[in-house]
């Protein structure tokens, strides 16, 4: 990534690739030895030439090793190596870099087959490439400018809050010939994002996935925090099986984990990556119809926590104690709602002078540019309001091991924010639920979800916790709870 240019990175997704990653990707793809001679290869988002520099160097060296004369090597560079990038500064630097490398082999005045334009509108390479490699741009759809309409023409990128790199996967697949290989490093989010569903369905249908290498928490790029995956596909690969690896960031090499099938890792419309045994376990948790012993929900979403919650909030008729689940700390909270979750009218909510003064002094922070109205003191969202008057169990949403969990009982009349909470649907001792969560098994389960966060942490959502607790209580305990819910009697929409 270009230093000091975060806005540009956000808009066009430039994150330049370190050489050791380039070398690994080319090795995974099989762009090695003299077999690369007279093989078409393209980087369709080449930037300043991180991939093309190594490609040119390998092509020259292997051609020399095979006894190819310089004039023929020059023609090969012009004919078989291709690149595209729409950033003129990076593009010009790429040309300079390639000229410098070629010159070191005694080759000059090359007419490179490089294009300074948008890859998404180019069709002349479709069906012609032996290799498509690269590090495509990562740009969320709401940051796209003129390329938005081009992106939406790609089926991989027309669902949900999409990302530009999904379109580049489809673009790359289109470029491959009948035996071509594609190898990209991209965010790992395509395995579990709603936006990438069409791509996952394509992989299930085509069975062209050769290997996935998960970099996990390892950060391959300078000045850019992203959790990445190296994906290798081949048009010549027609198998349900693929190899799964994890990348060792210290050794800069990958370690084989297991050969698994696409069907084994495709669970509830998402891809999960692990060995066969743990994928079977995860599949059971995610798909077996457990009894609904508990419900798990998100805490308050005031959208102005500093106004409603804090140690300086005045005591009043609408003040309750509220737990910040992410830290385990308690604060006062202004809760202008009745026991049915309905907003209190101004004459009640603002009856305490200290509360009225507090709200009025922070009115702009609550309204956030919206027009003023009498009940301006309401929360941004209504979630968790009704459950204030129930006993709950609070849980944070970040962990590395089970020791990072913060689990606390929250009594009826108290609130929760910045985390999740668990409600019993039948009488279950607090300790039983805690024991389910503080086990190493739960922490490992969360790690399998691969929702990476900085610092080596993983995160999880309400559905993840609810499925796990209900699965364990249904299938992995001998205890019988009163009023045990019957799966057959429950509304199956809950599952």
Regions found by a protein language model. Give the residues of each.
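Class I S-adenosyl-L-methionine
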Residues: 1-76, 82-101, 121-123, 136, ...
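C-terminal substrate-recognition regions of SAM-dependent nucleic acid methyltransferases
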Residues: 8, 229-394, 436, 444-445, ...
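Signature of N6-adenine DNA methyltransferases within the class I
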Residues: 10-11, 15-24, 45-53, 60, ...
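Conserved acidic residues
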Residues: 39, 79, 130, 210, ...
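Short, solvent-exposed loop/turn segments at the edges of secondary structure
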Residues: 76, 224-228, 415-417
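Conserved SAM-binding strand-loop segment of SAM-dependent methyltransferases
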Residues: 107-119
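Short, ligand-facing micro-motifs at secondary-structure edges
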Residues: 214, 399-414, 444-455
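A short beta-sheet element
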Residues: 402-435
């Amino acid at each position: 990534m270009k230093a000091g240019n975060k806005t540009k990175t956000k808009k066009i997704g430039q994150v330049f690739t370190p050489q050791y990653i380039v070398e690994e990707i080319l090795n995974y793809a099989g762009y090695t030895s003299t077999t690369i001679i007279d093989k078409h290869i393209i980087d369709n988002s080449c930037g300043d030439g991180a991939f093309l520099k190594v490609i040119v160097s390998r092509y020259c060296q292997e051609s020399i090793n095979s006894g190819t004369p310089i004039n023929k090597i020059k023609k090969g560079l012009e004919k078989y190596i291709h690149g595209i990038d729409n950033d003129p500064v990076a593009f010009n630097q790429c040309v300079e870099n390639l000229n410098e490398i070629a010159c070191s082999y005694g080759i000059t005045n090359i007419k490179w087959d490089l294009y300074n334009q948008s890859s998404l509108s180019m069709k002349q390479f479709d069906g012609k490439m032996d290799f498509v490699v690269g590090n495509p741009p990562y740009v969320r759809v709401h940051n796209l400018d003129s390329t938005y309409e081009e992106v939406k023409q790609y089926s991989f990128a027309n669902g949900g809050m999409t990302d530009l790199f999904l379109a580049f996967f489809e673009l790359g697949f289109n470029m491959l010939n009948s035996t071509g290989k594609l190898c990209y490093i991209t965010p790992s989010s395509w395995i579990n994002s709603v936006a990438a569903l069409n791509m996952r369905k394509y992989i299930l249908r085509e069975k062209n996935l050769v290997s996935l290498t998960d970099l996990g928490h390892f950060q391959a790029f300078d000045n850019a925090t992203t959790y990445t995956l190296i994906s290798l596909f081949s048009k010549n690969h027609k198998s349900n099986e693929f190899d799964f690896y994890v990348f060792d960031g210290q050794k800069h090499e990958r370690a084989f984990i297991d050969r698994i099938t696409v069907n084994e890792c495709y669970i509830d419309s998402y891809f999960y990556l692990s060995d066969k045994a743990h994928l079977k376990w995860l599949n059971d948790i995610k798909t077996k119809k457990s009894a609904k012993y508990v419900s798990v929900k998100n805490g308050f979403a005031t959208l102005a926590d500093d106004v409603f919650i804090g140690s300086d909030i005045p005591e009043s008729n609408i003040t309750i104690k509220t737990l910040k689940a992410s830290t385990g700390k308690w604060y006062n909270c202004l809760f202008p709602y009745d026991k049915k979750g309905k907003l209190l009218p101004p004459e009640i909510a603002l009856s305490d002078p200290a509360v009225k003064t507090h709200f009025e002094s922070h009115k702009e922070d609550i309204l956030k540019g919206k027009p003023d109205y009498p009940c301006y003191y309401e929360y941004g969202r209504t979630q968790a309001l009704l459950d204030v008057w129930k006993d709950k169990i609070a849980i944070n949403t970040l962990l590395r091991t089970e020791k990072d969990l913060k689990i606390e009982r929250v009594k009826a009349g108290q609130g929760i924010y910045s985390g999740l909470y668990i409600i019993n649907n039948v009488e279950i001792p607090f300790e039983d639920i805690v024991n389910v969560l503080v086990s190493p098994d739960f922490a490992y389960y969360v790690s399998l979800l691969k929702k990476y966060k900085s610092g080596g942490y993983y995160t999880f959502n309400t559905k993840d916790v609810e499925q796990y607790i209900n699965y364990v209580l249904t299938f992995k305990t001998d205890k019988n709870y009163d009023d045990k819910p019957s799966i057959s009697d429950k509304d199956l929409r809950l599952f």
